[in-house]
């Protein structure tokens, strides 16, 4: 199965997308606020009759023992006038608390980091987990590229799928 950890809005979006594909049989949401994760899991489960069969529930780190993909969305929200780099120290501290819990229960999964600043936190995850770099992936600039393509499509009045532009550096 796939497991999700962290930021509620990113987690909800990713979890919803995962329920739309038949890639996984199980999805567990882990949050320091277990009740919040339970509510999200229930909401997602109620939508499953329109998607693919899947077990969705709120869990704990012990529930990641047999998974092969762990998606990490943990981190603080970006505040007004705060850059992604301003968030580094706070998010590194969060990662110092969750990565050891992940590796305690599973040292063979692929880790996908989508927290910001993603490049720095992906590197941090490699170092904290001791996993080979090939098993720790970051979403990089995919979202920034999608936003650029959307806005260019709007400005140029063309389908954004026809835009071939990429953001290649974090900011």
Residue map of PLM features:
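Substrate/ligand-engaging "lid" and interaction regions
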Residues: 149-171
């Amino acid at each position: 199965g796939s497991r999700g950890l962290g930021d509620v809005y990113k987690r909800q979006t990713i979890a919803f997308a995962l329920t739309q594909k038949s890639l996984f049989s199980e999805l567990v949401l882990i949050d320091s606020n277990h009740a919040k994760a339970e509510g999200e899991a229930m909401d997602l489960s109620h939508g499953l009759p329109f998607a693919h069969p899947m077990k969705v529930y709120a869990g704990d780190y012990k529930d990641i023992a047999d998974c092969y993909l762990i998606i990490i969305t943990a981190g603080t929200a970006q505040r007004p006038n705060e850059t992604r780099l301003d968030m580094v120290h706070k998010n590194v501290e969060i990662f110092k608390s969750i990565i050891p819990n992940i590796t305690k229960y599973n040292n063979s999964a692929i880790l996908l980091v989508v927290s910001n600043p993603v490049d720095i936190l992906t590197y941090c995850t490699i170092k904290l987990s001791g996993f080979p770099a090939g098993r720790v992936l970051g979403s990089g600039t995919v979202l920034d590229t999608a936003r650029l393509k959307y806005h260019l499509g709007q400005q140029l009045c063309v389908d954004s799928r026809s835009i071939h532009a990429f953001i290649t550096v974090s900011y």
